[in-house]
Amino acid sequence: MSIGLQYLNKKEKETVNSFVKELREKLGGNILNILLFGSKVRGDFDRDSDIDIFILAREKGDIRDAVSDIAAEYFLEYNVPLAPVVYSLFEYTKNKELGSFFFEQLEKEGIAL
């Protein structure tokens, strides 16, 4: 079992893998990185927890809406709540320069997908 993915059940793993694959197929040229983070990585989740996925894009443009639409389709089809968070490279760089707590945590716990 992959480190950091041990808290995902089989259905969640399959859903996340399919979601990431579809993102890369549909938006691949704009996607720089995809990370799993949050309670499902740390192990402090509860039965109502969603699956946090960070997506780093070259440019945000229409990608946020496309990602949200795909995540909604996966929820309807698999009943697995995905919570994608999309940042552009510019936003990511600026927030890191400012010492954003979110990005510090993301670097500590994020698992590349």
Short names for language-model regions:
Residues 52-55:
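Short beta-strand->loop micro-motif that forms the acidic, two-metal-ion catalytic signature
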Residues 1-33, 41-47, 57-113:
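Catalytic core of pol beta-like nucleotidyltransferases
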